[in-house]
Amino acid sequence: MTTPKHPNAVSLVSAIGIDPGPTTGICLMEFINGGAYPIPEHNITLIQASSGTALRVLEAYLAHFYGDERITGRVAGVEAFVTGQSAGTRGKNADLTRQYVMKFTELLELFGYYPKVRKAADVKPWATDKRLLRAGIPKQPDSMRHSLDAARHCLYAAVKDAHQKDPLA
C-alpha cells in the first residue's frame, strides 16, 4: 500500500467482493485505513444483478474511482467456482459462471486491484453473520443472498489481504 501524496490526506482502502454467477452479487466497501467499525453505511454498497449487468456496473464504479490518490489499497475477493457432482456445477450456467470468475478478476486487475479467488468453504466459516453485522452489513433477505455472499468475500479480503481490523477483535 502506498501513502497519499498530501501529508494530511485520508488514506482509504477499497475492498470489493464478488459472488459470480447468472445472478451476481457485488459488495463495495471503503475503509479509512486502519479505521474502526462499524463503517458508516454510505461506505458499504450491496448490488445484485445479472452477470452482464453486474460486470458493467463494476466497470463504471472502478472507472469513477480510478486515479483517486486517497485510495492507497485495493483488494478484492472473488468466489471460486468449484466443480462437483451436483447438477449446478455442469451445463450452461456453470460454464457462464466459470467465464465470469475470469472476467471479473481481469477487470479488477485492469483497475489496479489485487483480486484473490477463494472457495466459499474457505471464506464462509470466518465471515459469519455476526462478523458481517459488526462490520455494518445487516442481514439480507434470501432474495439478496448473492450480495451477502459477496460481502463475505469483501470483508475477508479487507481483513486478510489489506490488514484491516477484524470487526470481532
Where are these regions (language model features)?
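Phosphate- and other anionic-substrate recognition elements at nucleic-acid/protein interfaces
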Residues: 2-169
